[in-house]
A protein has these predicted regions:
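Glycine-rich, aromatic-lined ligand/substrate-binding cores of catalytic
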Residues: 46, 304-308, 312-439, 498
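Bacterial Sec-dependent N-terminal signal peptides
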Residues: 1-31
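Conserved, well-structured interaction surfaces
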Residues: 39, 43-52, 56-66, 86-167, ...
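Membrane-proximal, proline-rich intrinsically disordered regions
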Residues: 21-73, 255, 391-392, 406-408, ...
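Long, intrinsically disordered, low-complexity segments
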Residues: 20-23, 113-116, 197-199, 258, ...
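Short coil/turn linking the two alpha-helices of tandem helical-hairpin repeats
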Residues: 162-165, 169-171, 213, 239-248, ...
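Extended amphipathic alpha-helical segments enriched in small hydrophobics
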Residues: 156-157, 233-234, 475-516
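Short, surface-exposed recognition loops and adjoining beta-strand edges that mediate ligand/DNA contacts
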Residues: 65-84, 173, 209-228, 244-346, ...
Length: 621
C-alpha cells in the first residue's frame, strides 16, 4: 500500500510543478485541446495531470513575503497581517497601514478554491480504471484509482474548509459540476450547513485514507492520511464553537440570503462538546502506536529548532512546496537574513508585542497578568553576556557577547523566534546591530521596522559564506500536534474548567519548551475558566507564533477590536531604529495596524459580488 501511495505521489507532485491552469480553460489545457472529458479520462497521462492539479493550492505557510504578486491567500501573509510581524517588502507590506474595502482586499482564496473543487468533482465523476491498450502500456488500476479518489475527496472537503475559515458562510458546491460556461452563482449556505457537510465528508474520507501517519523523510509531500482528516475536522469544530461563528458576532446575525435564510447561528454551547469529541477522536488516533508525538528529547532549544528542520512525528501535515528559497532567491531565507550579511535583505521584523509575550525561563511573563505574576528575572537595565553557539570555520563554538538584559533569561522559544540587537549571526559569527548608523539601520526601501528580525524556522547552515550551504530543504508545516493539544485544552475548558485535561494538555506544550507547569506558578489558575482561557490564548500566541494561526485566532475569539493581549489596532511597536546605539532601546511606534469590526471576516471578492444575483456580502463590507 505504501509503495502504491509513493508511486501516485511521485507522478502527481512532479506534475504539480509543471501544470497550472485557469478556472475556465483548465480542461483544454490539461488535455491538449481534446474536447471530451471521456477522451481525457481514457488517457492515463491526462488523468494523472488532472489529478495532480487538484493539489496545487495546498497552503504553504513558509511564504510570508516575496516579490510582488507571489504571495496569495494560500501562502502566509497572515503573520504580517496581525500583531506578529512587520513586513518590509512585498504584497503584505501595506496591508495593516490602511483601511480596506471589498475592492482592494488581497489574499483571497475564493476563486481558486472553487476552481479546485470543480476539478475535484469532475475527477470523482469521470476518472476510471484504464487498462493497457495497444502501444499505450501505462495503466490505472482499480486499487490505485480508489486511493486517488480518496485523496481528491479529502481535498474537496479541505478547500471548503479553507473557504469557511476565511469567509464563514459559503456556497457549498458538494458534488455539483458547473460547466465551463456557467457562472458560479449559488446562494451561501448557513454556517450550520457548512460544518455539517464538512463533518460528514471528513468523517467518511478518514476511513478511506491511509490509516497510519507518514513521517518518512523521503515523503516530501502533502499527502493526506486519516490523521490529517481528523485534525481538519477537529479544528473545524473548534472554529464552529468559537464566538465568531457561534452567535457572538452581532453584525453577522443580521446577514440573510435573499429568501430570508439567516446565515450565522445563535449561540450553541453544545458545539464545544462536539469540538471536544472531534479532538478526542484525533488524539486517540495520535496516541495509537505513536502516530504523532511532541518532539521532546529534553533539550528545549534544540527540539524547538529541529521541529521545523525535517519531517518528524509532531508534524501532522506538511508540504514540500515551500518558499524558503535559500540565499539566491527572493524569498524567506534572504528576507530573514540581516542586510549586513551577504545577500541578506533583513525585512521581516518581529513586533515588540510578540517579543514581550514570550515568557522568562522561569515560566513567568515580563509583566504581571491576571493569571501569572511578573518574573523577577526581567529587567531592562544594563547589559550582560549572552552565550550562544556559532560557526567558527568547520567547528561550532560557544561565544559570549554583551546584550541588553531585557534579552537574557528568556524561554527557549524566544531565542528560536527573535533575532535581536548585538546577537551574533550563526554562520559568520558577526555581531548584528539595527541602530542608526549600523548596516541594518532604517534606510533604503527594504528593512525591518522594529529592530528585531524573525529567526523562527530559519536553517542555521544557510548562508552565502563559501564554502557553505546556500539552500536547505525543510517542510512547510500545515498542522502540528502542539496546535491540536492547545485546541483540546481550550475546548475542554469551555465545557468544564475543573477538568484536569485543561492543564494537562496546556502543560504538555509548556514542558516541551522547558517551562514549569502553570499551576505550580499560580495555584489559583486551576479550575478558573477565565484565567485558564487567557493562559491558553497566550500559549497559542507563543507556541504558534508566525505560523499563520494568530490572524485567525484573534478573530475567532473576537478579541481583535479590544484593548489587551489580542489588540489588532493602533500601532505595533519596536526599538528606536532612528536613534544611535545609546538610545536604541527606547520603545517606539513602529508601524500602524488598522482593524475594523468588519475585518473579523473577509469580504466576498468584489468582482464576484458584481456578477452575482444570489450572493450576499459579509457584514460591514
Amino acid at each position: 500500500m505504501k509503495k502504491l501511495y509513493k508511486k501516485i505521489l511521485i507522478a502527481a507532485f512532479a506534475l504539480c510543478n509543471i501544470y497550472s491552469c485557469d478556472y475556465l480553460n483548465v480542461s483544454d489545457e490539461l488535455a491538449g485541446n481534446l474536447r471530451s472529458l471521456d477522451e481525457i479520462f481514457d488517457n492515463v497521462s491526462y488523468t494523472r495531470r488532472w489529478y495532480a492539479n487538484i493539489f496545487t493550492s495546498i497552503p504553504d505557510y513558509s511564504g510570508i513575503t516575496a516579490a510582488a504578486g507571489s504571495i496569495t491567500g494560500f501562502k502566509n501573509p497572515w503573520a504580517g497581517m496581525c500583531d506578529e510581524l512587520t513586513v518590509g517588502y512585498g504584497d503584505a507590506k501595506l496591508y495593516n497601514k490602511t483601511d480596506k474595502n471589498a475592492a482592494n482586499m488581497n489574499f483571497h482564496r475564493w476563486g481558486t478554491c472553487y476552481k479546485e473543487i470543480r476539478q475535484a468533482n469532475i475527477f470523482l465523476a469521470h476518472a476510471k480504471p484504464i487498462a493497457a491498450n495497444g502501444t499505450h502500456v501505462d495503466v490505472l488500476t482499480e486499487e490505485e484509482l480508489t486511493e486517488m479518489k480518496a485523496n481528491v475527496r479529502f481535498m474537496r472537503a479541505y478547500y471548503h474548509y479553507l473557504l469557511f475559515e476565511q469567509y464563514g458562510a459559503i456556497p457549498l458546491v458538494k458534488d455539483l459540476i458547473l460547466e465551463r460556461e456557467d457562472n458560479l452563482d449559488l446562494p451561501r449556505n448557513t454556517i450550520d450547513e457548512v460544518i455539517s457537510y464538512l463533518d460528514e465528508e471528513l468523517t467518511a474520507v478518514a476511513k478511506e485514507l491511509p490509516q497510519k501517519a507518514l513521517h518518512d523523510d523521503d515523503q516530501h509531500n502533502a499527502w493526506p492520511t486519516k490523521g490529517v482528516a481528523l485534525a481538519v475536522k477537529a479544528k473545524m469544530w473548534v472554529y464552529a464553537a468559537s464566538k465568531l461563528f457561534n452567535g457572538e458576532y452581532k453584525e453577522a446575525l443580521a446577514v440573510t440570503n435573499l429568501d430570508g435564510t439567516r446565515l450565522f447561528p445563535d449561540k450553541d454551547p453544545n458545539k464545544w462538546n462536539k469540538a471536544v469529541a472531534a479532538l478526542e477522536e484525533f488524539i486517540k488516533f495520535a496516541d495509537e502506536e505513536g502516530n504523532y508525538e511532541l518532539l521532546n528529547t529534553g533539550n528545549p532549544s534544540q527540539d524547538i529548532y529541529d521541529l521545523f528542520q525535517t519531517y518528524n512525528k509532531e508534524i501532522i501535515w506538511a508540504t514540500a512546496a515551500t518558499s524558503w528559497g535559500g540565499m539566491t532567491n527572493d524569498m524567506f531565507d534572504r528576507r530573514c537574513t540581516p542586510r549586513s550579511e551577504q545577500n541578506g535583505m533583513g525585512c521581516i521584523g518581529v513586533t515588540q508585542e510578540l517579543v514581550d509575550d514570550f515568557y522568562m525561563k522561569d515560566g513567568l511573563p515580563i509583566q504581571a497578568t491576571s493569571y501569572l505574576p511578573q518574573s523577577t528575572l526581567y529587567t531592562t537595565e544594563g547589559f550582560d553576556k549572552y552565550t550562544e553557539t556559532v560557526k567558527a570555520g568547520s567547528k561550532e563554538v560557544q561565544v559570549a557577547n554583551n546584550v541588553s538584559n531585557r534579552f537574557l533569561n528568556r524561554e527557549a522559544r524566544f531565542y528560536n523566534t527573535v533575532f535581536f540587537q548585538n546577537r551574533r549571526w550563526h554562520v559568520t559569527n558577526n555581531v548584528t546591530q539595527f541602530h542608526k548608523g549600523s548596516p541594518n539601520e532604517l534606510s533604503g526601501t527594504i528593512y525591518t521596522h522594529t529592530g528585531y528580525m524573525l529567526y523562527k524556522r530559519f536553517n542555521r547552515e544557510v548562508s552565502m559564506k563559501s564554502p557553505g550551504v546556500q539552500n536547505k530543504f525543510r517542510p512547510s508545516i500545515i498542522f502540528r500536534l502542539a496546535d491540536l493539544y492547545l485546541l483540546y485544552a481550550e475546548a475542554v475548558n469551555e465545557i468544564d474548567p475543573q477538568d484536569e485535561r485543561v492543564l494537562t494538555y496546556l502543560n504538555k506544550v509548556r514542558q516541551r519548551a522547558g517551562l514549569s507547569n502553570i499551576e505550580e506558578l499560580n495555584p489559583a489558575i486551576e479550575g478558573n475558566q477565565e484565567l485558564q482561557r487567557l493562559a491558553i490564548q497566550r500559549e497559542r500566541r507563543i507556541e504558534l507564533a508566525t505560523e499563520g494561526q494568530r490572524y485567525f485566532d484573534v478573530r475567532r475569539w473576537m478579541i481583535a477590536d479590544q484593548d489587551g493581549e489580542g489588540r489588532q489596532f493602533g500601532y505595533v511597536h519596536g526599538m528606536n531604529m532612528n536613534a544611535a546605539e545609546d538610545k536604541f532601546y527606547e520603545e517606539v511606534e513602529a508601524s500602524p495596524i488598522v482593524f475594523r469590526r468588519k475585518m473579523y471576516l473577509y469580504p466576498i471578492p468584489d468582482d464576484e459580488m458584481k456578477k452575482t444575483e444570489l450572493l450576499v456580502q459579509n457584514p460591514g463590507w
